[in-house]
Amino acid sequence: MEMAVANHRERSSDSMNRHLDSSGKYVRYTAEQVEALERVYAECPKPSSLRRQQLIRECSILANIEPKQIKVWFQNRRCRDKQRKEASRLQSVNRKLSAMNKLLMEENDRLQKQVSQLVCENGYMKQQLTTVVNDPSCESVVTTPQHSLRDANSPAGLLSIAEETLAEFLSKATGTAVDWVQMPGMKPGPDSVGIFAISQRCNGVAARACGLVSLEPMKIAEILKDRPSWFRDCRSLEVFTMFPAGNGGTIELVYMQTYAPTTLAPARDFWTLRYTTSLDNGSFVVCERSLSGSGAGPNAASASQFVRAEMLSSGYLIRPCDGGGSIIHIVDHLNLEAWSVPDVLRPLYESSKVVAQKMTISALRYIRQLAQESNGEVVYGLGRQPAVLRTFSQRLSRGFNDAVNGFGDDGWSTMHCDGAEDIIVAINSTKHLNNISNSLSFLGGVLCAKASMLLQNVPPAVLIRFLREHRSEWADFNVDAYSAATLKAGSFAYPGMRPTRFTGSQIIMPLGHTIEHEEMLEVVRLEGHSLAQEDAFMSRDVHLLQICTGIDENAVGACSELIFAPINEMFPDDAPLVPSGFRVIPVDAKTGDVQDLLTANHRTLDLTSSLEVGPSPENASGNSFSSSSSRCILTIAFQFPFENNLQENVAGMACQYVRSVISSVQRVAMAISPSGISPSLGSKLSPGSPEAVTLAQWISQSYSHHLGSELLTIDSLGSDDSVLKLLWDHQDAILCCSLKPQPVFMFANQAGLDMLETTLVALQDITLEKIFDESGRKAICSDFAKLMQQGFACLPSGICVSTMGRHVSYEQAVAWKVFAASEENNNNLHCLAFSFVNWSFV
């Protein structure tokens, strides 16, 4: 034993001696050994035990090093690598924080100047008021500001306008020319994209943003000047004239057309001067403002479809940062001529929050997105480049905007659709689906059926999220299959379809998203199976390319969209797209604004009359603010390819389908409204039915009256809302059905919805007989007379069927009549209620 220990010490001593340099200091590895280890580390930073042993055998200069030592070397090497990366990251973060701190200090200085200015103005106004009160002989004198007349047709005049635009823009971006207030819901912080503000008490609507972007100033300016690439509402932008300004800058005359967000108002266009220059401090500026005069552009007929809007001094101030990157200030200041839209839409055109979300915030987010992509921070699946996916999103959005606006110069013309006065139907015979490889094309085009609706008390983000996640609640699979089949044929001809059953399953496959997840691009696969016996094993799946935006409920003024188009399962980059979808825009209603959409110049459909989600007339005065302040405009547009000889048939199908979608949206809106069907808030369950709280009381009271026992254990001090909550959370499945010849369910508690595997929206399509098997239906029929005579009936244990086809067993079912507690009539039968006790899936 002693000999073994001595041998081990001798080997250790020899090993250490081999790693002493000429000065006697301990050196763990020689330069040759380190070089060999570095080569292996470059190939595999974390080699396994077998790989390390193999390394010792293959590399003779490492033969005298123990495997454990090599393991420790690789561990230390990985730690040093991690430390270097972390140090580099911290330096980058420190630079960003320093730049952000500088930005915040400047913002603080600007706010202090603004406060001082307001204090001075307040003191001056008090002094003037005192003078007027004390000196009644004082006459007010109105002075009109005098502007020097400049010739906008000469370079000298344009340069004068450009310099004035620059001064006005800088005073808005970094000064106090506009009274800025923080954008609601966009509190600045470490995780924020930037600092956002909107105007208060100024001419028009304005928004401002400033933030840090890891791109060079020239690159940022180039991106932002290409407005159609990031501003989804920009239809076209054309530079008519460009000439040097003489000071190193450039002056451009620009004509821009924008889309209208709904079918209810005309689109806007702008005729502007854009001035690009650099400042003495190294900053880069792009500023822009409207010019007087028509400046209609190359096509006067096209310009006649637009209302000329005004752009007040706006633009971008881009300052380089130490260590790379830039600080950017963005100002958008517009006058959208709200007088030209229906009263119900005016708040949309007078909202700085909407301009902030659509333009200012979108611009900064887009720049940040490109910066992250260029730095390799964004990785997308399916091998798609970010630029390709971004192009798909832009094409979907542009195609939907084209359909909603239906510009004549794009080939759109309006046709009449019999029996659908609330739906606009337009056709476009200039659109072609066939690609270059398919030389055969049929005469036809694309038909669009569209409508706009006013909804109340429906959060746009919640509505769009529901439509995305529950497509089967509103969509017809056969219509999707029709569009997909037409797309595969590569022409307008309808190739024919075999009978297909939709399985009810949709699979959403994400492709990419923006940095803050405000927009998602995805492929949706709708699973279908042929009903024909010879094709029983063939897949009839339908694939849709889809973008979903604005599902953040906290984004004030944000537009929510769900836009989709059928696409080939091979998903080629140049795939033709015929988009359809939904757009929901919040409208900040003003008190006293009661003008509804029927006064609009365009045909529309007002769902509010049938939703009945507002307060009752006797309570309207107490809730006037809530009933008028939460409104949104829903725009629906669906496009269908057609062949000329089938135009009328496709138009009829399109009208019928859009009407069906509208009806489904109506039910969805009723269900998801915060003042709709909810355990905590009373509401109308359906047109003509009582409020949820009242119905819960009727169900409980009628049960006690007929069976002599309590359905719910209610505290003597419990409120009316607690009755609804107890009913909603009851362990037994409780359902109510109407007294029509074919009873249809109108309400169910949570257990009832779970048992039927359905939602409150789809519940109203389920009849009573659908949920029972044959024996259950016989039991209902045999006890129905008893139920109607004595007011209740107890059904034996049995089996019922969920909407998904699953069997559900229950120990007992109790049915009873529900009476409406009315002062005039105590025997007012309202509906039938059922309670399924101890139910479970078989």
Curated annotation (Swiss-Prot):
Bias (Basic and acidic residues): 7-20
Induction note: By auxin. Repressed by ZPR and miR165. Induced by DOF5.1.
Keywords: Coiled coil, Differentiation, DNA-binding, Homeobox, Nucleus, Transcription, Transcription regulation
Keyword Coiled coil listed: yes
Origin superkingdom: Eukaryota
Inactivation phenotype: Plants display strongly reduced auxin polar transport in inflorescence stems and hypocotyls. This phenotype is probably due to altered cell differentiation and morphology. Repression by miR165 suppresses DOF5.1 over-expression mediated upward-curling phenotype.
InterPro entries the record matches: HD, HD-Zip_III, Homeodomain-like_sf, MEKHLA, START-like_dom_sf, START_lipid-bd_dom
Subcellular location: Nucleus
The family this protein is said to belong to: Belongs to the HD-ZIP homeobox family. Class III subfamily.
Function: Probable transcription factor involved in the regulation of interfascicular fiber (cortical cells) and secondary xylem differentiation in the inflorescence stems. Required for lateral shoot meristems (LSMs) and flower meristems (FMs) initiation. May be involved in the determination of vascular patterning and organ polarity. Directly regulates the expression of AGO10, ZPR1, ZPR2, ZPR3 and ZPR4. Required to regulate adaxial-abaxial polarity and leaf axial patterning.
The protein's name in its UniProt record: Homeobox-leucine zipper protein REVOLUTA
